[in-house]
Amino acid sequence: MLRDLQETDVKAIYDINQEALGYSFSPEDTASQLARLSKDSHHFLLAYEDEASHALLGYVHAEVYESLYSKAGFNILGLAVSPQVQGQGIGKSLLQGLEQEAKRRGYGFIRLNSADHRLGAHAFYEKV
């Protein structure tokens, strides 16, 4: 089930960031960033929650991308799914939710950058 990220998700976000992305950003710093970014309309934070357990299984974080050469769109800053549930359509659902929000806002595109060494991520993005 898709929903907004919440302050109660901090531990799960920290775990997913560490396990899926290899980032070791402290839970305290994660909580601080989540609180700040949640209030900023230029950031969109969407969660995927297991309907039975209510556990956070993944999230997408996008920011508004604006320039002098195009209309506004979204720039994906992070898309992460717990490794234990990857391959079950969660990442695709998160991207579809982001696409719906982009359409609702009248945005014309969604973009992202992915590091060269993240070959699994590249294959996923090409597939969706």
Which positions does each model-derived feature cover?
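Conserved active-site alpha-helix within GNAT-family acetyltransferase domains
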Residues: 92, 104, 108, 116-128
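Conserved acetyl-CoA-binding loop-helix of GNAT-fold acetyltransferases
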Residues: 81, 87-100, 123-127
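Conserved functional loop/turn residues at catalytic and ligand-binding sites
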Residues: 9, 78-80, 85, 89, ...
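Short, cationic motifs built from Arg/Lys/His that form the positively charged side of catalytic pockets
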Residues: 1-6, 86, 118
